[in-house]
Amino acid sequence: MSEKEIWDKVLEIAQERISNTSYQTFIKDTQLYSLKNDEAIILVSLPFNASWLNQRYSEIMQAIIYDVIGYEVKPHFISEDELASYNNVNTQEVQEPQVQHSSIDDKTWGKEQFNMHNTFDTFVIGPGNRFPHAASLAVAEAPAEAYNPLFIYGGVGLGKTHLMHAIGHHVLSNKPNAKVIYTSSEKFTNEFIKSIRDNETEAFREKYRKIDVLLIDDIQFIQNKEQTQEEFFHTFNELHQNNKQIVISSDRPPKEIAKLEDRLRSRFEWGLIVDITPPDYETRMAILQKKIEEENLDIPPEALNYIANQIQSNIRELEGALTRLLAYSKLQGKPITTELTAEALKDIIQSPKSKKITIQDIQKVVGQYYSVRIEDFSAKKRTKSIAYPRQIAMYLSRELTDFSLPKIGEEFGGRDHTTVIHAHEKIANDIKSDPTFKQEVENLEKEIRNQ
C-alpha cells in the first residue's frame, strides 16, 4: 500500500470518527509527508493548526493510522513553514512502511503515551467537570486506594481523555517506575485480534495484566465484540484482584452501553461513576483565556466573548473555533475584531435548529414518546411495540445526523446497514401514506432539535 493510499484510507476513517466541523477545518486537507522510524509526519497549512492538532488529535489519529497499517506510529503534525527545518534534520529517503512482525512490540509504560499538554495544571475546572476532576486527582494520588474502577462518561470533547492523560502524568511523576498503559477499546480489540492471529496471546496478556494502572478510553466500542469482552473481563478481574487501578471512559454510563455483558456492566459499577457535562459560559471563557495565554496570543475580549457565547457544545469545538479564527485572520491579513470573528465562524456557528444531534438524543426522545427503554433499541426484541419505534429512530438518525449507515446500525445493537436502509424506506413510505403519522414524526423531529 502506497503512502497516498494509506492516507486516503486514514482520511476516510477520520471523517467518520471526527466531528464534521473539525474534520473539514483541520483534517481534510492534511497530507502524509513521510512514514518512517515509527513516526508519521503530517503536513498542515499553518503553525497554529499544527500545534493544536498535536495537542488535541494526536491520540485519535494514532488509533486510526494503527487501524489502517496494523502497527503503531506516532503522528506529528508540522506546518509548511516548519518543513525546511524538518528536512535539514531528516535527510534520509522516505521509505514504504514495513509491517512489523509482532503486535506486542510496544513495552513502553512511560510518559511517551501521554500528551504533554494534558495535565491537571492545564485542566480548566468548572461546575460541569469539578467532580470528575476531583475523582481523577484522587485516583492519581493513590491508585487503587480511592475509587476502583473509576468510570468517566460524557459527550465528545468534554475532557475525558484530558483527565485520563492527566492521571497518567501524575502517577508517573510520583512513581516513575510505575507501569501505566493508556489505550482505547478499539486499539485493545485490534491488538487482541492480531495476537490471536500471530499466536501471541500470552504476550498480549502479559502486556495488559502485569501493570499498575490501566487507562482505557471509549469502552463503548467493545459492545457486540464477544471475544474482546471475554478477554477484557479476565483482564479487569486480574488487575482488580491484584489491587491495580483501572480507569475507564465512555460516551455513556454502563447501563446504557448496549450489548455489554452484564458481568462487565456490574464490574464497571463497582467503583465510582462520574459524568462530565458541557461547560458553562464562565468555564468556556476561562478555557479560551487559558489557551491564548499558553500560546501568547493577543485576542480582544469581545472576540472571546463572541466565541464563548456561540460555541456551547464542547471544549474541542470551542478551541477549534479559536484556531479557525486565528487561521482566518492570518489568511485574510486582517486584525481580529468581533465582526471578523463572526465572519470566520459563520459556517460553524450552530443555531438551535442546526446544533449537532446524536443518535442517543434521538433514541431518548423516541423512547420517551413510545415508552421504550433506551437499551431496547439495541436488543433483539421484535415485538411491534419495540420494533416500530426502533425503525422510526433509525429513520430519524439517517435524516438528522451525518453518521454512516454502519455507524447507525452499530448504535442499534450492531445491526447491519441493510437493516437501517429497510427501516428508512419503510418509515418514509408510511409518512407519505399517513398524514397523521407524518405529523407525529415531525413533532418528534422538532423535539429532538429543541433539546
Swiss-Prot record:
Stored InterPro entries: AAA+_ATPase (IPR003593), Chromosome_initiator_DnaA (IPR001957), Chromosome_initiator_DnaA-like (IPR020591), Chromosome_initiator_DnaA_CS (IPR018312), DnaA_C (IPR013159), DnaA_dom (IPR013317), DnaA_N_dom (IPR024633), DnaA_N_sf (IPR038454)
Domain of life: Bacteria
Region feature (Domain IV, binds dsDNA): 330-451
Stretches assigned to coiled coil: none
Keyword Coiled coil appears in the UniProt entry: no
Gene Ontology MF terms in the entry: ATP binding; ATP hydrolysis activity; DNA replication origin binding; lipid binding
Region (Domain II) location: 71-112
Keyword tRNA processing recorded: no
Subcellular location(s) per record: Cytoplasm
Classification via PROSITE patterns: DNAA (PS01008)
Major localisation: cytoplasm
Function: Plays an essential role in the initiation and regulation of chromosomal replication. ATP-DnaA binds to the origin of replication (oriC) to initiate formation of the DNA replication initiation complex once per cell cycle. Binds the DnaA box (a 9 base pair repeat at the origin) and separates the double-stranded (ds)DNA. Forms a right-handed helical filament on oriC DNA; dsDNA binds to the exterior of the filament while single-stranded (ss)DNA is stabiized in the filament's interior.
Domain topic, free-text comment: Domain I is involved in oligomerization and binding regulators, domain II is flexibile and of varying length in different bacteria, domain III forms the AAA+ region, while domain IV binds dsDNA.
UniProt name for this protein: Chromosomal replication initiator protein DnaA
Organism of derivation: Staphylococcus epidermidis (strain ATCC 12228 / FDA PCI 1200)
